[in-house]
C-alpha cells in the first residue's frame, strides 16, 4: 500500500500558492506569490559576525539577519513615504503640431550627436585607449573641468564632448605584436589595462567590454552594460574599476545592488583584485556610522574601499550621508529595476555628487515607452527631464477625430521611437552568448503539449460555471469562495492546468495526498513529466524543474519521495546556507541527486547549476524574462554539454491562450499604449480583463495548426525530440549529426532563438 504524506490544512481565507497567509483574494495570483518569495529570499539569511564584513576571503554569505531586518524596515519607510507622495497625479497635455515639430527637431539633433559619438567611440575602442602621458599633457583640458562639462548634455557641451573624442580617436594606442596568439594578446592587454586584476583571466569579449567602459569614462558619459545573463558583467565592471584604481584614481566608487548579491560582489572583488579594499555598507544606523568612521574618511586616498550597498540603504542615506562624498563612479546592478519611471532610487541618485553612472542589466529592453523614458532620463537627464512631458509626446487621443488618421498617428509614434533608439545606441553595450561565448554548448527550447484528463476537463467546466465547491461536496472549506474577481478565476484555471489537486486540496480540506498513481493519472502535464523523466534518467541527465507554485513543488516532492528519488529544492523559504549545501551536493559528480526543484523567482536568479543539462519549465511565468533567467541557471559559462529546455503546456487551455497573448505583448504584462494613455497591466490600479473576455478565450476556435500541434506527443516523436546529436558539432564545418526534424508537429514545437527586446539589434 502506498504511504501518504500529511498535508497541513489552512483555512481557505488564508491560502495562497506558496503557503503564506493572504489578506485579499488577489493575493492568490502568481504575482503576489512570487513577490513574497523574493521578499522571503532576502529575509532568509545566515547570521554572521560583524567583522566578517571585512573578511577578504570569507564565506559567500555575508548578509546577517540584522541586515535583512534593517532592509525590511527601510523598505517599509520608503513605501509609506511614497504612498503619501502619490496623492495626486497630473494629466499630460496633448501633443499638437508645433510640439511635435519641436520634439522632432530636438530628437534629430540629439540623434546626430549620438551617431557621431558612436562612430568615434568605436574608433577609440579599436585604436586603443588614451595613454596616461597623453592625459597628463598640460594643453589638454583638465579631467575635472572637462568631465563636469561633458556631464551636462546640453547642445554646446555635447559638441565639446564630441570634439574631445575626435581628438582622442586620432591618437593610436600601442600596437599589439601580430605574432602573438589571440590568448596571448588578451593577456597582454589585460596586464596593460587592468594591472590590479590578478585573480583571473578575462575573456576576449570581456576585455572589449572593459575597453568600452573606459571609452565612456574618458568622455564623461553614462552607460548601460546589458550583456546577456551569464557573460560576466560583474567581472567586467571590476576590471574597469581596477583600471581606474591602477591609474591613480582612488575613487570613491559606489556599487548599489540587491541585498542578496552584496556578498557576491564583495567576494568577486576579493578574488579578482585582492589588492583593492571593499566593504559592505549595511546594518542598522549605528553600524553604518561605525563603518563610515573606520573605513570611509572624508579624504579619499588609495586605501579608500569600493563601497557596496543595497538599494534600500542607498535610498535612505543618499540625502543625509552619501551626498557628501564626491563619487567618481556609481554602479547600479540589476539596473532593470530602474525601468520604472517612479523608482525612488532614480530620484535619490540625483542628490549624489557623481561623475558617472553605470547600469548593469541582463534583461533586454521591452517594447514600452515608459521604460524607455527611464533609460533616457538615466543617460541624458538634462534632455529628458519630465516623464509627463514625454507621455504627452505620444498622446494623440484628442486628435483622433479631426486632425490625423490612426495610421498617421502610428507613423508619428514610430518616428519618435526610432529616433529615441538612435539616441540610446552609443550608450548601451549588449552581447548575446551565441555571439561571443562560442565555446558555450548550444541550447534548444521545445514546447511540449499535454491534453487535459477527464478529471481536469470536469474541474474546468465547474470553474467556469462557478460550481466547483458544490461538485466537491459539503466538505469544502468556506471563506474565500470562488465567485468574485476575474483574476481569481484565471488563477484557478491555471492551477487546474498544473494539477487539479491544487484546487481539490484547498477546497475539501484533505489531510492526505492521493496515491502516486492518482497524482499522475489526474493531470496531463504530470503524465508528460513522468514520460520525460523516465527517458532522461535512463540517459543519466540531471534535471532542473521550475514552477511558480510552491504548492506544486510540494506535490512533486511527495511524488519523487514515494518513487525513491533523492531531490534538491530551493524556494523562497530556503535559507542561504541550506541553498549552498544543496547546490554543492547537486553539483558533485558522485551525487545520487539528479532532480532539482526550484521556484521560478527564488531559484531563477544568482545561482550556478551547470551540473544539469536539462531544464523543465513546468509552467510559464507571465514575464518571459523570468523563464529566460531560469534557463540560464544551467546554460551559462561552465556548461560543457548541450542543453535542452522543455516548456510544458496544457493543450487548448486558458494556459496556452493567455500565454500566447502575453508573449505577443497584447495583454497581462507589458506597458502598452492605448487610448493615448499608459497602462501597467500588473499594477494594482489597472483594470482587470472582463469575465466575458476570459471566457471568450476558452471558446476561441483553434486554427488547424493549433489542432495539429496541441495534442499528446507520441513515444516515437518524444524519443526523437530528446535526441541532442544535432546540438553536438565536434569539428569546424561538420554537419549536424541528427536527422532533420520538423520545428513543429503533433504535441510539440521548437522555439526559434531570438534575443528579444526592442533594442535587440542595437549592437548587431
Curated annotation (Swiss-Prot):
Ranges for region Disordered: 1-42, 129-152
Primary subcellular site in the record, as a coarse category: nucleus
Subcellular location, record wording: Nucleus
Binding-site residues, ATP: 227-234
Domain Helicase ATP-binding, residue spans: 214-382
Name of the molecule in the record: ATP-dependent DNA helicase DDM1
The keyword Ubl conjugation appears for this protein: no
CDD domains: DEXHc_HELLS_SMARCA6, SF2_C_SNF
Motif window: Nuclear localization signal 1: 145-152
Lineage: Eukaryota, Viridiplantae, Streptophyta, Embryophyta, Tracheophyta
Effect of inactivating the gene: Reactivated transcription of heavily methylated silent loci, via chromatin demethylation. Hypomethylated chromatin; gain of histone H3 'Lys-4' methylation (H3K4me) but depletion of histone H3 'Lys-9' methylation (H3K9me). Altered leaf shape, increased cauline leaf number, and delayed flowering onset (due to FWA derepression). Accumulates developmental abnormalities and transcription derepression by slowly inducing heritable lesions (hopymethylation) at unlinked loci. Derepressed paternally inherited MEA locus in male gametophytes and seeds. Reactivation of several silent retrotransposons.
InterPro entries: Helicase_ATP-bd, Helicase_C-like, HELLS_N, P-loop_NTPase, SNF2-like_sf, SNF2/RAD54-like_C, SNF2_N
GO biological process: chromatin remodeling; DNA methylation-dependent constitutive heterochromatin formation; DNA-mediated transformation; epigenetic regulation of gene expression; heterochromatin formation; retrotransposition
Species the sequence originates in: Arabidopsis thaliana
Coiled coil residues, start to end: 62-88
Motif DEAH box per record, residues: 333-336
Span of domain Helicase C-terminal: 528-695
The protein's role, per its UniProt record: ATP-dependent DNA helicase that plays a role in formation, organization, stability and heritability of heterochromatin and thus regulates several physiological traits. Binds to the nucleosome and promotes chromatin remodeling in an ATP-dependent manner; induces nucleosome repositioning on a short DNA fragment, and, possibly, could be guided to target sites (including silent transposable elements) by small interfering RNAs (siRNAs). Can bind both free and nucleosomal DNA.
Gene that produces this protein: DDM1
Quaternary organization: Interacts with the MBD domains of MBD2, MBD5 and MBD6.
Amino acid at each position: 500500500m502506498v504511504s501518504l504524506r500529511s498535508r497541513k490544512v489552512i483555512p481557505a481565507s488564508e491560502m495562497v500558492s506558496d503557503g503564506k497567509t493572504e489578506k485579499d483574494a488577489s493575493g492568490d495570483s502568481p504575482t503576489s506569490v512570487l513577490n513574497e518569495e523574493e521578499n522571503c529570499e532576502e529575509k532568509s539569511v545566515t547570521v554572521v559576525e560583524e567583522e566578517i564584513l571585512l573578511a577578504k576571503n570569507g564565506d559567500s554569505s555575508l548578509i546577517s539577519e540584522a541586515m535583512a531586518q534593517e532592509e525590511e524596515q527601510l523598505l517599509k519607510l520608503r513605501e509609506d513615504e511614497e504612498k503619501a507622495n502619490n496623492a495626486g497625479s497630473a494629466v499630460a497635455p496633448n501633443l499638437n503640431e508645433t510640439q511635435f515639430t519641436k520634439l522632432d527637431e530636438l530628437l534629430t539633433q540629439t540623434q546626430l550627436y549620438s551617431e557621431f559619438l558612436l562612430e568615434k567611440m568605436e574608433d577609440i575602442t579599436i585604436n586603443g585607449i588614451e595613454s596616461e602621458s597623453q592625459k597628463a599633457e598640460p594643453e589638454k583640458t583638465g579631467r575635472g573641468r572637462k568631465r563636469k562639462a561633458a556631464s551636462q548634455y546640453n547642445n554646446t557641451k555635447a559638441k565639446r564632448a564630441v570634439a574631445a573624442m575626435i581628438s582622442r580617436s586620432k591618437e593610436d594606442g600601442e600596437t599589439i605584436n601580430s605574432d602573438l596568439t589571440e590568448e596571448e594578446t588578451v593577456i597582454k592587454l589585460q596586464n596593460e589595462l587592468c594591472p590590479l586584476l590578478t585573480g583571473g583571466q578575462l575573456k576576449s569579449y570581456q576585455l572589449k567590454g572593459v575597453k568600452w567602459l573606459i571609452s565612456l569614462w574618458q568622455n564623461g558619459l553614462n552607460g548601460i552594460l546589458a550583456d546577456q545573463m551569464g557573460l560576466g558583467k560583474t567581472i567586467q565592471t571590476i576590471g574597469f574599476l581596477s583600471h581606474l584604481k591602477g591609474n591613480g584614481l582612488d575613487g570613491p566608487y559606489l556599487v548599489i545592488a540587491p541585498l542578496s548579491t552584496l556578498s557576491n560582489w564583495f567576494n568577486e572583488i576579493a578574488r579578482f583584485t585582492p589588492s583593492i579594499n571593499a566593504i559592505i555598507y549595511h546594518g542598522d544606523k549605528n553600524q553604518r556610522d561605525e563603518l563610515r568612521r573606520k573605513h570611509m574618511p572624508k579624504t579619499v586616498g588609495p586605501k579608500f574601499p569600493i563601497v557596496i550597498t543595497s538599494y534600500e540603504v542607498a535610498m535612505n542615506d543618499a540625502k543625509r550621508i552619501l551626498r557628501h562624498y564626491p563619487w567618481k563612479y556609481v554602479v547600479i546592478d540589476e539596473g532593470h529595476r530602474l525601468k520604472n519611471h517612479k523608482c525612488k532610487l532614480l530620484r535619490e541618485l540625483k542628490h549624489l555628487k557623481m561623475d558617472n553612472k553605470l547600469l548593469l542589466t541582463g534583461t533586454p529592453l521591452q517594447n514600452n515607452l515608459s521604460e524607455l523614458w527611464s533609460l533616457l532620463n538615466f543617460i541624458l537627464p538634462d534632455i529628458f527631464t519630465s516623464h509627463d512631458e514625454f507621455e504627452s509626446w505620444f498622446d494623440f487621443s484628442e486628435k483622433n477625430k479631426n486632425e490625423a488618421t490612426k495610421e498617421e498617428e502610428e507613423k508619428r509614434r514610430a518616428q519618435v521611437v526610432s529616433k529615441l533608439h538612435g539616441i540610446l545606441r552609443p550608450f548601451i553595450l549588449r552581447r548575446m552568448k551565441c555571439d561571443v561565448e562560442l565555446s558555450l554548448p548550444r541550447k534548444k527550447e521545445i514546447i511540449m503539449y499535454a491534453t487535459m484528463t477527464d478529471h481536469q476537463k470536469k474541474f474546468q467546466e465547474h470553474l467556469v460555471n462557478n460550481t466547483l465547491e458544490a461538485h466537491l461536496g459539503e466538505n469544502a472549506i468556506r471563506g474565500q469562495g470562488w465567485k468574485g474577481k476575474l483574476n481569481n478565476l484565471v488563477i484557478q484555471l491555471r492551477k487546474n492546468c498544473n494539477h487539479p489537486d491544487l484546487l481539490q486540496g484547498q477546497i475539501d480540506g484533505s489531510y492526505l495526498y492521493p496515491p502516486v498513481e492518482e497524482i499522475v493519472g489526474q493531470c496531463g502535464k504530470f503524465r508528460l513529466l513522468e514520460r520525460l523523466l523516465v527517458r532522461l534518467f535512463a540517459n543519466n541527465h540531471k534535471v532542473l524543474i521550475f514552477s511558480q507554485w510552491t504548492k506544486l513543488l510540494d506535490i512533486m516532492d511527495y511524488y519523487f519521495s514515494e518513487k525513491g528519488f533523492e531531490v534538491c529544492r530551493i524556494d523562497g523559504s530556503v535559507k542561504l546556507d541550506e541553498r549552498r549545501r544543496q547546490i554543492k551536493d547537486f553539483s558533485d559528480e558522485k551525487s545520487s541527486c539528479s532532480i532539482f526543484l526550484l521556484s521560478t523567482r527564488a531559484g531563477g536568479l544568482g545561482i550556478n547549476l551547470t551540473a544539469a543539462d536539462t531544464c523543465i519549465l513546468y509552467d510559464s511565468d507571465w514575464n518571459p524574462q523570468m523563464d529566460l533567467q531560469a534557463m540560464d541557471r544551467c546554460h551559462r559559462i561552465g556548461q560543457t554539454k548541450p542543453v535542452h529546455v522543455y516548456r510544458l503546456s496544457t493543450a487548448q487551455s486558458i494556459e496556452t491562450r493567455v500565454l500566447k497573448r502575453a508573449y505577443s505583448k497584447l495583454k497581462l504584462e507589458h506597458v502598452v499604449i492605448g487610448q493615448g494613455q499608459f497602462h501597467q497591466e500588473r499594477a494594482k490600479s489597472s483594470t482587470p480583463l472582463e469575465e466575458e473576455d476570459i471566457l471568450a478565450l476558452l471558446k476561441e476556435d483553434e486554427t488547424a495548426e493549433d489542432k495539429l500541434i496541441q495534442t499528446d506527443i507520441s513515444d516515437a516523436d518524444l524519443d526523437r525530440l530528446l535526441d541532442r546529436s544535432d546540438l553536438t558539432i565536434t569539428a569546424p564545418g561538420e554537419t549536424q549529426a541528427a536527422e532533420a526534424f520538423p520545428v513543429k508537429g503533433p504535441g510539440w514545437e521548437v522555439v526559434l532563438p531570438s534575443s528579444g527586446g526592442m533594442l535587440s539589434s542595437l549592437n548587431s
